[in-house]
Amino acid sequence: MACRYPFSPAKVAITRFFYPSPLSRSTTPLFCPPSCRIRVGNTSRMLTSSSSVASENPKSEMAKFLASPNPKSSASEPGPSPHDVLSAPTSAGHISEAEETLSDQLRNPGSSSSSSPSQSSTNNLSSKNAPFKLSSTYSLPSNISVPPEVREHLIEWSKNVLEHSRYVIQEAQKKFVGLGLKVNEMTGYQEVERLKYMVFEKEDELQRLREHARTAKAAYDEAVAARSEAQRETNILLERKHSWTDADVSKFTSLVRSDHTSSHAVASTSIALKDAEIAVDKSFSQLMQVILQRYHEEQVWSDKIRSVSTWANVAGLAINFIIFVGAVLLVEPWKRKRLVEKLEERVASMMERVDHRLEGVEGHLERVAAGSASASAIKEQHSDAAIQGVEDMPSNSTANPLEFVSPQTIPLMAAVDPTINGSESQSDPFFTQTIRGFPNYLDPLVKPSQKRDLAVAGMAGAVAAWILIGAVRLVRA
């Protein structure tokens, strides 16, 4: 496979692997090497694998086109590079497909979403290798299929939004600048700005005049040096006046002429130097005057700002005082009244619930009182009957009085007096001291009871058993 860019053996093997022959099952190349591709944006549509196509079908139009390329297009546009070209198919059918796809793309440049995968890969490569450029329109990825109408609407909408945002930003900047100018005009800072620029101008003028004075001083020094040199040479010639020659006479004449010229130059340069020094002094005094004016205006402006800030602080304090007085005289009584009303409503609702519950408790107490009265009456009747029975049987003096009570009346009596138990009698606890300072749920262990005695006995037995086991182990050891 002959290409414009030569292959290495490894690249040839890879190309043969990824470019199957037309007789194989798959005719679509899986991978396109970067050296055998077609450029998308080039109207000449130059293929790098021209020799292979021409050798396969020498009578095809593509082979003729490749055999005789357009000199204008080939001269105006460079050859394809490995980064901005598409894959080139290896058969004539593939070439025709690529040609049709390229012609469709040239006809419809906007419909890039319906292009082939090879074109999308080329777009991705060109976008990666191209330099970063901020676009003013919104561009969708190429792998998303969007109808052309929707894409056009999106592009138009993005352009409108971008233009509107730019317009808003520009207007905001203009308004901020105008607001700053108005504030400066109100506070008198424009005069300070004018004097500041005047100070800069005076400084530049002073620098320029100083440079001019230095130049005049250099010219004056040069003229003085030339005059001194001419006078020195004249004095040397006058010392040997008796031995002058024609050359010495002409030299003396030129020296007198140069001395006269240098004297005039010294006079003119001295005047220019004096004028330059006077201008420098005048400019310096003007600069000092402008600096003093600027300082004065800045002091006046700072005094205005300070007075404005003072009055603003006073106004803020007055507003805060008014708000405080209003809160104390108006808001707080209203809040207090509202709080009292809510509290009264809650208390009334709570009292209603309490009254309802008290009515239920009163009914329950009435039922308990009736039950206790009936139980006491039954107890009196049975006690009278027991006394009568004891009188009738004096020999059975140790009998339990509850034996004469019927089993049906014992629960009623136990409900009134819990100490009554028909089955067995309770004995007094062994420990009668109450331990204080513990919560209510520890009453069985704190108050004297048989349960506490049993618990203490169990704990004592456990301690005794532990001591006994320890003693046995100690003896065995």
Curated annotation (Swiss-Prot):
GO terms for biological process: inner mitochondrial membrane organization. The chain crosses the membrane at residues 311-331, 455-475. InterPro entries: MDM33_fungi. It is found in: Mitochondrion inner membrane. Residues 332-454 are mitochondrial intermembrane. Residues 111-128 have a biased composition (Low complexity). Keywords: Coiled coil, Membrane, Mitochondrion, Mitochondrion inner membrane, Transit peptide, Transmembrane, Transmembrane helix. GO terms for cellular component: mitochondrial inner membrane. Its main location: mitochondrion. It is a multi-pass membrane protein. Residues 49-128 are annotated as: Disordered. Residues 476-477 are mitochondrial matrix. The keyword Mitochondrion applies. Residues 190-233 form a coiled coil. Belongs to the SHE9 family. Homooligomer. Required for the maintenance of the structure of the mitochondrial inner membrane. Involved in mitochondrial morphology. Causes growth arrest when highly overexpressed. This is Sensitive to high expression protein 9 homolog, mitochondrial. It comes from Cryptococcus neoformans var. neoformans serotype D (strain B-3501A). The gene is SHE9.
